């Protein structure tokens, strides 16, 4: 960190720039060391200018939304963590369409769509975090995925905005192909008209299901591993004997074995060690190598 670097960042951003900001307070697992710089751009134009300056300074950076799909190492991040929480606008440019910025939460989008009696996004009520995060990994639930509902995907690369038809992007299970440095900043969703009562019933059904199967009670990142094709990660983990297993403050949930939880005082190293043990044992038993759904970010990784 240098005074000149901080001055350049502060000049570039109309929002906030924090120094040595602990990332544990910005992630759902409540672990992670400090980022050298934590920038909160005020809007999309602010983000464009920030990215240009960060790149000109050759600083590593990463985007953080709701912090639900990331595990930051205990050493923190030697670069700039960029929060999109102020990029949270939503509008309906025409009937059946909603444009949502990446920093809006999934629940805010569901509420907005419900208020306009538009259906197709109810499943997002089951997924914590932000629209940007859901799009970046093509998050899904109940047989639906986020990108399937996208008419236009709006991204930023090298400080420039690009718009693409959603159906022309390469995406699949928990995956959206993005170019190096490409950031999802917004999307236009194409939805169907629905009845308020039917939408409400579906939301209530999803809420009950989540309470019954995922009432975890401790900080977590949601599903830690992707489901292998034709398999369920939780079952493989359970059959390997990890239900309730604990390393330091990190534990495999006794309620849902694909959730790793912070029972208090956990370190990022605890989670990384536990995840490694799970992967090794499952591989030995089943021949299947589990892949993390959670992004593990160490202090030297560059975006």
Curated annotation (Swiss-Prot):
Name the source's superkingdom: Bacteria
Principal location class: cytoplasm
Which residues are the active-site ones? 174, 223 (proton donor), 293
Q: What's the catalysed reaction?
A: UDP-N-acetyl-alpha-D-muramate + NADP(+) = UDP-N-acetyl-3-O-(1-carboxyvinyl)-alpha-D-glucosamine + NADPH + H(+)
Its Gene Ontology biological processes? cell division; cell wall organization; peptidoglycan biosynthetic process; regulation of cell shape
Q: What is its EC number?
A: 1.3.1.98
Per the record, the coiled-coil ranges are none
GO molecular function terms attached to this record: FAD binding; UDP-N-acetylmuramate dehydrogenase activity
One Pfam family name is: MurB_C
SUPFAM superfamilies attached to this UniProt entry: FAD-binding/transporter-associated domain-like, Uridine diphospho-N-Acetylenolpyruvylglucosamine reductase, MurB, C-terminal domain
Cofactor dependence: FAD
Keyword Metal-binding part of the UniProt annotation: no
PANTHER family under this entry?
UDP-N-ACETYLENOLPYRUVOYLGLUCOSAMINE REDUCTASE
> Tell me, what does this protein do in biology?
Cell wall formation.
The name under which this protein is listed is UDP-N-acetylenolpyruvoylglucosamine reductase
Classification from the root reads: Bacteria, Pseudomonadati, Thermodesulfobacteriota, Desulfuromonadia, Geobacterales
Q: Which gene encodes it?
A: murB
């Amino acid at each position: 960190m240098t005074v000149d670097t901080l001055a350049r960042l502060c000049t570039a951003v109309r929002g906030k720039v924090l120094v040595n900001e602990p990332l544990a307070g910005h992630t759902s697992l409540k672990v992670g060391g400090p980022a050298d710089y934590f920038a909160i751009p005020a809007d999309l134009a602010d983000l464009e200018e920030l990215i240009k300056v960060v790149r000109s300074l050759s600083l590593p950076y990463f985007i953080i939304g709701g912090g639900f799909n990331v595990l930051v190492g205990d050493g923190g991040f030697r670069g700039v963590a960029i929060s999109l929480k102020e990029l949270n606008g939503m509008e309906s440019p025409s009937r059946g369409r909603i444009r949502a910025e990446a920093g809006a939460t999934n629940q805010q989008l569901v509420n907005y769509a419900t208020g306009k009696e538009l259906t197709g996004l109810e499943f997002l009520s089951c997924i914590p975090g932000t629209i940007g995060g859901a799009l970046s990994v093509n998050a899904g639930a109940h047989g639906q995925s986020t990108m399937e509902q996208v008419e236009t995907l709006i991204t930023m690369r090298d400080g420039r905005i690009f718009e693409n038809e959603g159906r022309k992007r390469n995406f699949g299970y928990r995956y959206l192909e993005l170019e190096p440095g490409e950031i999802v900043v917004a999307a236009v969703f194409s939805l169907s008209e629905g009845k308020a009562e039917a939408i409400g019933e579906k939301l209530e059904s999803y809420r009950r299901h989540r309470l019954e199967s995922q009432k975890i009670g401790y900080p977590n990142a949601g599903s830690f591993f992707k489901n292998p094709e034709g398999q369920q990660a939780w079952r493989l983990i359970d059959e390997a004997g990890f239900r309730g297993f604990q390393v330091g403050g990190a534990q495999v949930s006794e309620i849902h074995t694909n959730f790793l939880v912070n029972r208090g005082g956990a370190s990022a190293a605890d989670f990384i060690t536990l995840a490694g043990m799970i992967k090794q044992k499952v591989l030995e038993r089943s021949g299947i190598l589990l892949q993390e759904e959670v992004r593990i970010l160490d202090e030297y990784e560059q975006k």
